[in-house]
């Protein structure tokens, strides 16, 4: 289903299903023999959501033969995406750890989804974490974690707001201090924003950020939105999605239908133009650094993305 202005969703609908898919990958990585990250809460979200395509990374044993017939290299592709999510998660985990070590005591997660960093990471006692997402997404997460008796390891402030609306006002109302440096992350977010909304997002971050603030971004450049690349990916995935839908008895969204595919300003260039010092690492390099190289003949098994770090000049 294509996106529309002002659309919203339950966790098992539309963009919400992608948060469950990422939780599935984090859960699979956590249960693997040599996990790069640990997320003991991801499995609880999946259990609360029930059966669905979002459990794709959690096959116990071999995947169904019909799925393998539709996508012969299914296992390799699943492993590649699990590794991508694991390395991405570690990148942002480490970002927050480094920011805390540097003395930053405000953290902000934009479109937090089923992120459980408030519960699973170590934080300074005087730090605060703001999580921004739609009300129904935050409510699902809170209800699920409350049932597990989970307690945040940081002062945790959920901010129920749509990032297409006036979220800075909601953030300040939650106690965000524009006079103190902050650490921001935008993980798995940008393709789900229209180009103008992406620019406005970073304009607002710049306005809200005191000198010394930091931001980490999963960035998607021109190659990611290339129409020919997307067409090939969709064609390859059609047969797999059709078989999976027949097996599960429910529609499986084409994730590209949830993206805004228009040309947009590069996030790194945008921030650099406003005086932020920007460095970048490609996803290929990030995965390689953690020993998770993707097979050379499966270059499209993971997103063609890069991971940005930027700091606002003092």
Swiss-Prot record:
GO terms for biological process: methylation. Transmembrane segments: none annotated. It comes from the Bacteria. S-adenosyl-L-methionine binds at residues 133, 162-163. GO terms for molecular function: methyltransferase activity. It holds the Pfam family LCM. It is an enzyme of class 2 (transferase). Keywords: Methyltransferase, S-adenosyl-L-methionine, Transferase. Its EC number is 2.1.1.-. Belongs to the UPF0677 family. Exhibits S-adenosyl-L-methionine-dependent methyltransferase activity. NCBIfam families: mthyl_TIGR00027. This is Putative S-adenosyl-L-methionine-dependent methyltransferase MAB_3886c. It comes from Mycobacteroides abscessus (strain ATCC 19977 / DSM 44196 / CCUG 20993 / CIP 104536 / JCM 13569 / NCTC 13031 / TMC 1543 / L948) (Mycobacterium abscessus).
